[in-house]
Amino acid sequence: MGQKVNPIGLRIGIIRDWESRWYAEKDYADLLHEDLKIREYISKRLQDAAVSRVEIERAANRVNVTIHTAKPGMVIGKGGSEVEALRKALAQLTGKRVHINIVEIKKPDLDARLVAENIARQLENRVSFRRAQKQAIQRAMRAGAKGIKTMVSGRLGGADIARSEHYSEGTVPLHTLRADIDYGTAEADTTYGKIGVKVWIYRGEVLPTKKKAEEGGK
């Protein structure tokens, strides 16, 4: 089961938290669509800013958006001009007050989404899929990953028949729930069609907090 399911979804509530944190009854569907619109808008507007994920919290008529990015300077802009323009655009999109937080990703080579997007961009620039994957694996292992697995699927190298090829180094224990495994996907638009990229990065075990460990011992 651990081999097939999304590793982040499997670990939610155990070692991962939800990316949308709010509660609603009647308005649930509307707010969910609003979240999707916010994420879609941010990913389009900041597609060159290495945005990994967007967290959304809600309270009354206010939306708190946290953007995790490897290039905070590009998101903030000169004197905060970019982030202010983004805040106004999101406020117009949602009709609510929007507050934006920006969190810098210190090690982008350990972020699966950013690694997948990097491989996808290289494939679009006609870099060999083997070379792109192997370079990404080397960078991740140098950055301190315990293990990494990458997979590309599609008409690789312009072949007539689509296939999948994957490379891995180290260990990636998908069944171990306390294993901190980051998972990310991306798509490369090549002249031969789309190529899908998947990346799994094992960053080490997350041990339970001392309080939980004490409760378990009672």
UniProtKB/Swiss-Prot annotation:
It comes from Geobacillus kaustophilus (strain HTA426). It comes from the Bacteria. One of its GO terms (biological process) is translation. This is Small ribosomal subunit protein uS3. PROSITE patterns: KH_TYPE_2, RIBOSOMAL_S3. Belongs to the universal ribosomal protein uS3 family. The lineage of its organism: Bacteria, Bacillati, Bacillota, Bacilli, Bacillales. Part of the 30S ribosomal subunit. Forms a tight complex with proteins S10 and S14. Signal peptide: none annotated. Pfam families: KH_2 (PF07650), Ribosomal_S3_C (PF00189). Binds the lower part of the 30S subunit head. Binds mRNA in the 70S ribosome, positioning it for translation.
